[in-house]
Amino acid sequence: VFMPPVSTNLADHGYVTDDLVDHYRARAKGGVGLIITEVVTVEPTYTYLPGDMCCYDDTFIPGWEKLAAAVHEYGCKIMPQLFHPAYMAFNIPGTPRLIAPSFVGPSYAREAPRPITVDEIHELTHQFGDAAVRMQKAGVDGVEVHAAHAHGMLGGFLTPLYNKRTDEYGGSLDARMRFLLEVIAEIRERCGKDFIIDVRISGDEYTDGGLTLNDMIYVSRRLEKAGVDMIHVSGGTTIKRGSAIPAAGTQQASHAACSREIKKHVNIPVATVGRINEAWISEELIDDVAADICMMGRANLCDAEFCNKAAAGNADDIRPCIGCLRCLNGNMFGNRIYCTVNPDVERDEA
């Protein structure tokens, strides 16, 4: 069981805090095999959430060293999720006009973005590489590149919903994935062959005019050819947030159908995610060859000892996730993470 990104808003102006270290240390002690952190912004101009972590200069490295060491103490691996928010940037006074693949963005964006220029694409590619190098120096085990949910810059370039460009970065699926492939090549060249690169994608955007499962099978094969080590299959978009982060009353293991099909076409590990909130579900998914890895986020928020309890056969002692999305709804407004069934989640200590 791995833990996928779940925003906490526990950072301080982008810097790792003791609260963040305690939060992730508790999950590592609780038996999680690998933690993928919430988004980590790779450049200083735009912020996704005010309490997110950053790594756009070397001053952030000491905090990441402390976080990596805390997680490694319990045999757990850690990978930050590298990200640029594009049209998803938080509304902070003084922030310049939003940039994005095109002039279009989701209806909840604070303004119509301007298209990023080709020179800015090249600069941002280098900034992704810079951030990965800093993370490697800090001792993390790899990075996840976020390209799912029509979300942020790379997800926005990949989807036809928001990429309306007519240059070499728009039009065909090959052109729309060019930016993502250039970022992967930059990280691989600068961090070496032994540094793990994982890419998070939507296996299907479940939206008219969006990316389909067939599209994403093709993208996954291209990612494998580009040297990616793992594919993290989510689904949906932030336009219909419930399609990406399923709530109570929705299907458990909601994106497993996509991960199962993608797994048939690649030879690298495939992870699935999406309301996998009980141990038996993850066991069934692995046995059924729907994925190689199960990502369990909210389950590990509700009970930091989820994995240890499940492994010991004490599933009845696990504090259950009820799918209320309280963890999401508050932090999208800049508030610290909160959980209905685990009110101490922001203060968890190992």
Tell where the protein language model's regions lie, with residue ranges.
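Flavin-dependent oxidoreductase catalytic cores
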Residues: 1-350
